[in-house]
């Protein structure tokens, strides 16, 4: 009794004993208790911007303003950079992406690679036995005989192997992990060109390693030089923005995703955080990805324009602009968006950024327009640009429309077990043909514009891993997709443009390997018969007699639908005397065929027709505003020697 009375007397309603029990609501009783709140910074930034994820939250650490869930945009004050997160403290690691496996940092002006993570390496690079991770099936030795021509002033000498220098040591490790043994021709030149700070226009045949051609030099220089300082305006902004250092524009979501997947490999353990944005997917989740940090942004023009209008992306810090499949983006009507992105936003102007344009074809009119984007650039032509590879065996079969399905069944039954890509012209036909093949017990799937992004991704994944060995596709997959081990391409429906045919069959025979391309031809395809005839002859392929018959029936072989404009697409238009530019500098060419070597060429180029309509009179073709496509016709004459008229995108 005395003990109880003593305990009552000792009670204190202000007792602050931390060990005393307290009431916990039922819905919180099973949750793990977090660390105590602090009013001072923990292991993160001591002076973080108040406008991070936690508004007016000045705490660092995991949930603070500079931790994994915090951070303002992509910058620090050059003391510590964590791959896209803000951290203002010059002395501390401050959380950030060092909490993520395989993520490095930029600390005190130095690149600090992250620790190796074996599980992540397997996810990114696979194993040598995995057919999905075999350097996209690259046969590097077959590249040795491909001729290369580089023209421009002070063309740097090509590299012959991957070494450090000129490549960053961490990038070199990732290249080795990806099992790239030697640079492809386009990579041999792009690495020294970009490291010299030069602009580049590269024309290379499909499957020649163009993605590595721009990722390797851009990432190498980024690893060495670190992030750009944060603009003063970003420190005062209430809206979280991404400030990428490198911007890659691609025409389709599939190509953008493919570039992003490659970027993830080669940014492994680095401070660079890649992000991808494209239409047809939830923009909210993409904005959240951007808010976590973005140093290399891969985007389609339409979605990027949307994000710029929303104020979620700033291009003020872009050092490197890459246009992949540039001609296709213009053909698809993206010219107004590209023009607005490059010239109408806060991107640094020509001369203050490096611009790289990559594609398999660059017709003369595209080259002329490149003058608006490039400064003192080097023109790189690899192989027979704008044509097909001799590694692809082309077979042209005369098949009427009513006989196509039965002919396809015979073709597939006689083929090997490799992956076959079948191109059709319409979405309806893609679904119809896929259903037909499944009913015939073939493992088929399809991609086209009406399928959701997740459906397209699942279809591509099934095709790549072999669960479906037949992929029926519309033109959405014709450009840029790098699917390893495609042994056969079937043009069930031929396109109306010979350039599209070139890019379709380029899905096989990639990167020095061999492949087969079969086309179903009939008189409904007479508009490309001349272009196809010349293409087969150029690639030393067998020309079926019926092509000659159809050419004779159509007089001159019909309209070539763009083939004639491609004939000189592997030449630098600045060498022509009909274009402005005055005297020309040196050019380098390299061929292992025996007679090739280094040399120089000079050609006069004073004066010339300056108008976009060319040297013709009234009715000359030109670029102009025409609805949303960006194409138009000019009826005015811009001819005349020394004309000061300038081609315009508008």
Curated annotation (Swiss-Prot):
It comes from the Eukaryota. Pfam families: DEAD, Helicase_C. One of its GO terms (molecular function) is G-quadruplex DNA binding. It is found in: Cytoplasm. The Q motif is unique to and characteristic of the DEAD box family of RNA helicases and controls ATP binding and hydrolysis. Belongs to the DEAD box helicase family. DDX3/DED1 subfamily. A motif (DEAD box) lies at residues 324-327. A motif (Q motif) lies at residues 160-188. Residues 61-70, 594-630 have a biased composition (Gly residues). It catalyses: ATP + H2O = ADP + phosphate + H(+). InterPro entries: DEAD/DEAH_box_helicase_dom, Helicase_ATP-bd, Helicase_C-like, P-loop_NTPase, RNA-helicase_DEAD-box_CS, RNA_helicase_DEAD_Q_motif. Gene3D superfamilies: P-loop containing nucleotide triphosphate hydrolases (3.40.50.300). The lineage of its organism: Eukaryota, Fungi, Dikarya, Ascomycota, Saccharomycotina. The keyword Plastid does not apply. Residues 1-13 have a biased composition (Polar residues). ATP-binding RNA helicase involved in translation initiation. Remodels RNA in response to ADP and ATP concentrations by facilitating disruption, but also formation of RNA duplexes. This is ATP-dependent RNA helicase DED1. Residues 1-114, 549-650 are annotated as: Disordered. One of its GO terms (cellular component) is spliceosomal complex. Residues 191-380 form the Helicase ATP-binding domain. CDD domains: SF2_C_DEAD. PROSITE patterns: DEAD_ATP_HELICASE, HELICASE_ATP_BIND_1, HELICASE_CTER, Q_MOTIF. SUPFAM superfamilies: P-loop containing nucleoside triphosphate hydrolases. Coiled coil: none annotated. Keywords: ATP-binding, Cytoplasm, Helicase, Hydrolase, Initiation factor, Nucleotide-binding, Protein biosynthesis, RNA-binding. It comes from Vanderwaltozyma polyspora (strain ATCC 22028 / DSM 70294 / BCRC 21397 / CBS 2163 / NBRC 10782 / NRRL Y-8283 / UCD 57-17) (Kluyveromyces polysporus). The keyword Membrane does not apply.
């Amino acid at each position: 009794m005395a003990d109880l009375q003593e305990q009552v007397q000792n009670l204190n309603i202000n007792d602050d004993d931390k060990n005393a029990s307290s009431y916990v609501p039922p819905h919180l009783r099973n949750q793990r208790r977090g660390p105590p709140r602090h009013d001072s910074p923990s292991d993160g930034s001591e002076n973080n911007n108040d406008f991070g994820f936690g508004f007016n939250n000045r705490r660092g650490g995991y949930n603070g303003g500079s931790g994994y869930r915090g951070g303002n945009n992509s910058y620090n004050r050059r003391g510590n950079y964590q791959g896209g997160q803000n951290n203002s403290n010059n002395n501390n690691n401050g959380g950030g992406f060092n909490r993520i496996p395989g993520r490095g940092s930029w600390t005190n002006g130095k690149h600090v690679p992250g620790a190796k993570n074996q599980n992540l390496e397997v996810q990114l690079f696979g194993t040598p036995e995995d057919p999905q991770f075999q350097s996209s099936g690259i046969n590097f030795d077959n590249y040795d005989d491909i001729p290369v021509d580089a023209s421009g002033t002070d063309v740097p000498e090509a590299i012959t192997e991957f070494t450090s220098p000129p490549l960053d040591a961490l990038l070199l490790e990732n290249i080795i992990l990806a099992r790239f043994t030697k640079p492809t021709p386009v990579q041999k030149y792009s690495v020294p060109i970009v490291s010299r700070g030069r602009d580049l226009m590269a024309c290379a045949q499909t499957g020649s390693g163009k993605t590595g051609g721009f990722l390797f030099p851009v990432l190498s220089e980024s690893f060495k030089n670190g992030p750009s300082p944060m603009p003063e305006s970003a420190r005062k902004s209430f809206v979280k923005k991404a400030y990428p250092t490198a911007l890659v524009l691609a025409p389709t979501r599939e190509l953008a995703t493919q570039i992003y997947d490659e970027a993830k490999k080669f940014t492994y353990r680095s401070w660079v955080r890649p992000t991808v944005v494209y239409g047809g997917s939830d923009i909210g989740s993409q904005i959240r990805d951007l808010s976590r940090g973005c140093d290399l942004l891969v985007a389609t023009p339409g979605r990027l324009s949307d994000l710029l209008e929303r104020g979620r992306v700033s291009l003020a810090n872009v050092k490197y602009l890459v246009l992949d499949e540039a001609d296709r983006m213009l053909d698809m009507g993206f010219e107004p968006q590209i023009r607005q992105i490059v010239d109408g936003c806060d991107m640094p102007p020509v001369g203050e950024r490096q611009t790289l344009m990559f594609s398999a074809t660059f017709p003369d009119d595209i080259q002329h327009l490149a003058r608006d984007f490039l400064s003192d650039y080097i023109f790189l032509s690899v192989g027979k640009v704008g044509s097909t590879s001799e590694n692809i065996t082309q077979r042209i079969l005369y098949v009427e429309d009513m006989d196509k399905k039965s002919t396809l069944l015979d073709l597939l039954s006689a083929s090997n077990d490799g992956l076959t890509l079948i191109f059709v012209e319409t979405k309806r036909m893609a679904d119809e043909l896929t259903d037909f093949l499944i009913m015939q017990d073939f493992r088929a799937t399809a991609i086209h514009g009406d399928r959701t992004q997740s459906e397209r991704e699942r279809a591509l994944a099934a095709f790549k891993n072999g669960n479906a060995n037949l992929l029926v596709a519309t033109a959405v997959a014709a450009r840029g997709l790098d699917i390893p081990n495609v042994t056969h391409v079937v043009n069930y429906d031929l396109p109306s443009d010979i350039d599209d045919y070139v890019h379709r069959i380029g899905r096989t025979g990639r990167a020095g390997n061999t492949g087969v391309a079969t086309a179903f031809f009939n008189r409904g395809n007479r508009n490309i018969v001349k272009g196809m005839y010349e293409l087969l002859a150029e690639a030393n392929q067998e020309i079926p007699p019926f092509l000659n018959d159809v050419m004779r029936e159509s007089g001159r072989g019909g309209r070539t639908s763009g083939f004639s404009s491609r004939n000189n697409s592997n030449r630098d238009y600045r060498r022509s005397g009909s274009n402005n530019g005055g005297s020309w500098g040196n050019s380098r060419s390299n061929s292992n065929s025996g007679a090739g070597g280094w040399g120089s060429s000079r050609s006069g180029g004073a004066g010339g027709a300056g108008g976009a309509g060319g040297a013709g009179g009234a009715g000359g073709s030109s670029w102009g505003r025409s609805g949303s496509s960006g194409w138009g016709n000019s009826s005015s004459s811009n001819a005349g020697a020394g004309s000061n008229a300038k081609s315009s995108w508008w």
